[in-house]
């Protein structure tokens, strides 16, 4: 997927809280992901996984706390402090995000979707980069087809390709295998493994054990917006991800 080496960047959550009215979606979230680490989030629906990922992506502003992106040498890279109510938190520009609900434009072709975002992100050599990704996600032969004609799995491939356009140093994924067939899951696992091995920092939410979950070297379980487990022990990581919804 990529021949580049990343400048490893971590993610630090400092006492992050998120409230929606009287509902606390996240409470006292404090942990750090090391540059180049691959971390899986587990927990029931509504436990706070998606909210945490959206905060990391800069799409949701926390009610309190601070989000920073330390580099491998310890300097803060792209700090994202809590902003005013009118100013959203800014995510690190090199982060890629894949949402649980595929965020693609139905009335555009697969190629048009990627070219649009490549130009918005000022991707170098956008046409060549888009063609390369379409080949790698197995959609080059369908590049001129409207996305509304695609299956859910094919739409997810477009969304994943979009997140990889600028070869991000941080990749955030919310249940990325949703709608993918076994071949698609195998492709995604191979892609994430290559990115991880190149130094990309990965934070992803997962439901159950799969080929993708085996990539995680750390698992964090959320329950009612709180971190209730955080381990790098191989056996415990597997246990948490095997019973991710328990």
Tell what function each PLM region has.
Residues 115, 119, 125-142:
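Conserved ABC ATPase "signature" region
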Residues 167:
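Conserved catalytic motifs of ABC-family nucleotide-binding domains
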Residues 206-207:
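H-loop/switch region of ABC-family ATPase nucleotide-binding domains
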Residues 42-44:
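The feature captures the beta-strand-to-loop junction immediately N-terminal to the Walker
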Residues 57:
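Helix-to-loop junction immediately C-terminal to a conserved catalytic motif
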Residues 160:
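Hydrophobic anchor residue at the start of the ABC signature
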Residues 171-174:
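Catalytic Walker B motif of ABC-type/P-loop ATPase nucleotide-binding domains
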């Amino acid at each position: 997927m990529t021949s580049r080496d990343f400048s490893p960047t971590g993610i630090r959550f400092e006492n992050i809280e998120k409230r929606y009215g009287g509902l606390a979606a996240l409470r006292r979230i404090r942990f750090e992901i090391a540059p180049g680490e691959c971390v899986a989030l587990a927990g029931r629906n509504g436990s706070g996984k998606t909210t945490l990922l959206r905060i990391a992506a800069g799409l949701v502003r926390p009610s309190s706390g601070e989000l920073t992106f330390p580099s491998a040498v310890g300097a803060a890279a792209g700090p994202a402090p809590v902003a005013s109510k009118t100013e959203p938190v800014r995510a690190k520009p090199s982060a890629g995000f894949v949402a649980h609900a595929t965020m693609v434009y139905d009335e555009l072709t697969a190629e048009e979707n990627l070219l649009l975002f490549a130009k918005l992100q000022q991707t170098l050599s956008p046409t060549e980069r888009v063609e390369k990704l379409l080949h790698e996600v197995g959609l080059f032969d369908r590049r001129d087809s409207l996305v509304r004609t695609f299956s859910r799995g094919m739409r997810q491939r477009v969304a994943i390709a979009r997140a990889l356009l600028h070869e991000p140093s941080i990749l955030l994924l919310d249940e990325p295998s949703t709608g993918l067939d076994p071949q698609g899951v195998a492709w995604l696992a191979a892609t994430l493994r290559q990115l991880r091995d190149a130094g990309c920092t990965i934070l992803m939410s997962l439901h159950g054990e799969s080929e993708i979950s085996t990539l995680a070297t750390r698992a964090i379980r959320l329950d009612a917006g709180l971190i209730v487990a955080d381990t790098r022990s191989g056996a415990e990581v597997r246990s948490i991800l095997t019973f991710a919804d328990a």
